[in-house]
């Protein structure tokens, strides 16, 4: 199948370096927010007035999508009575190249005399459609314990234990979903958080009565606290990128069998509107004489913890895993990760994050006799007192007039020759487009923060998580041959990580960011650049930062160690651009 025009998979792209500074993709609290529209037209208009767009001397050659040859057919699976084969993505399409338009796996019926031993003995009631095994005491109790209502069928009488309506915990649906950590996107449900095992004790939070799911060990409300911003100054884009974005990047590189110790902050998919907006607005200041003031306020409203064992899996995930072939076939296991993610959440912090970045023109600041410390002081105290108490500003070593000048420039930043070049805002939690709209108009006020905090309380985002690989949900309680399936999932996860990486994309021009969407690569261009490869720009001889190529395969195990390498040549640094950050080689223990 080499050189074919095929492939239509839904796997998201490995998250690029900006992920975690951006918020939670497709989370409760992010729906309805469209920050990509705020201010972008004005920014582009100002460029059009002051600069003439020109094309870089680059000839774009369409790159066609290319798949590997088919793998060999597996033997006939005795339980599914099917056999399988698959193909890998070798080269994504790019620059209007020919796409891959058909499936990257094939399944066909077959006949075998081998017996199927895939059934796990059930001592209770076997649900008719979902195949779930539930305790007989849960029959006819008014709850859909099976997920298909078969436990409530043919009942002479319903003995309903819960007499009062109770709400579901905030964000509980996303907490039950699998998460693709290569994209920070939530996928299909892997846990059933609508299963209660007959439990009906109410849990009160803010006078609201909640029903605790069987799988949940604890869901603890947190005090809102004060709306305070932590402000930090960065004298260059490279400092800003390293300290704000790269430190909160996705977990795209794994050791320890894809296990990640501790709790970490979630990011956002580069495919989301907010992710693209953030890249376009901040990347254009790379290799400019701009300085950055980054401010952030965190709000925690609840802590969530999953039970450590005996979990009730969602019936859709249960059935999909049961249909996996025991003989390894990457295509079937790859589809499981596409549909249900790579990991599941064991602990989480729910709440919101309000952050903004002021981008200042260093030369204009010097002409106006401003320092970044002045901007810091004015921004911080404008939030606290609304710019009303002159003595506070004087005590900070900056005049009232100077502070008012800065704050007015923030509102008028789309005009030419201003000291404030941009205000980039990211609001997570609250699901309020109104708040996001206001956030782009001026620095946050106490009233705006109170409005946002009230919205976060009832519609929080998942901002931090602790996770386990999806294969940890495959236990002998639910699956025969669980050890075989787990080992297959581990192997497939390593292959999946390599296949969905944007390192397969050709470089974008002008520090554009390549993003792999299924089997197609796109370039996200900084504001001021456009074209399929960001090749049309107002800037000449732009410094190009280096980007890593794909990792090599792991070496064979020698001396209980194995290694792999990668090269900084996709593209290499050019015109004084920055080198790649991170290691060029990795070493792991092996046996």
Swiss-Prot record:
The membrane spanning regions, by residue number, are 252-259, 262-269, 379-386, 392-399
Which residues carry the post-translational modification Phosphothreonine, per the record?
418
Annotated ranges, domain TSP type-1: 64-117, 545-591
Limits of the MACPF domain = 158-504
Regulation of catalytic or functional activity = Membrane attack complex (MAC) assembly is inhibited by CD59, thereby protecting self-cells from damage during complement activation. CD59 acts by binding to the beta-haipins of C8 (C8A and C8B), forming an intermolecular beta-sheet that prevents incorporation of the multiple copies of C9 required for complete formation of the osmolytic pore. MAC assembly is also inhibited by clusterin (CLU) chaperones that inhibit polymerization of C9.
Q: Where in the cell is it found?
A: Secreted; Target cell membrane
* Signal sequence extent: 1-32
Q: Which residues bind Ca(2+)?
A: 138, 141, 143, 145, 151-152
- Reproduce the UniProt comment on modification after translation: N-glycosylated; contains one or two bound glycans. Not O-glycosylated.
Q: Which UniProt keywords apply?
A: Complement alternate pathway, Complement pathway, Cytolysis, Disulfide bond, EGF-like domain, Glycoprotein, Immunity, Innate immunity, Membrane, Membrane attack complex, Phosphoprotein, Repeat, Secreted, Signal, Target cell membrane, Target membrane, Transmembrane, Transmembrane beta strand
Q: Which residues pair up as cystines? A: 65-100, 76-110, 79-116, 122-133, 127-146, 140-155, 162-200, 378-403, 503-550, 505-521, 508-523, 525-534, 557-590
According to its UniProt entry, one GO biological process term is: killing of cells of another organism
Q: Where is this region: Disordered?
A: 568-591
Provide the EGF-like domain boundaries: 505-535
The entry annotates sugar attachment on 70, 73, 101, 243, 551, 554
Q: Which family does it belong to?
A: Belongs to the complement C6/C7/C8/C9 family.
Clinical condition linked: Complement component 8 deficiency, 2: A rare defect of the complement classical pathway associated with susceptibility to severe recurrent infections, predominantly by Neisseria gonorrhoeae or Neisseria meningitidis.
Q: What is the protein named?
A: Complement component C8 beta chain
What is the organism field in this record?
Homo sapiens (Human)
Q: What is the lineage of its organism?
A: Eukaryota, Metazoa, Chordata, Craniata, Vertebrata
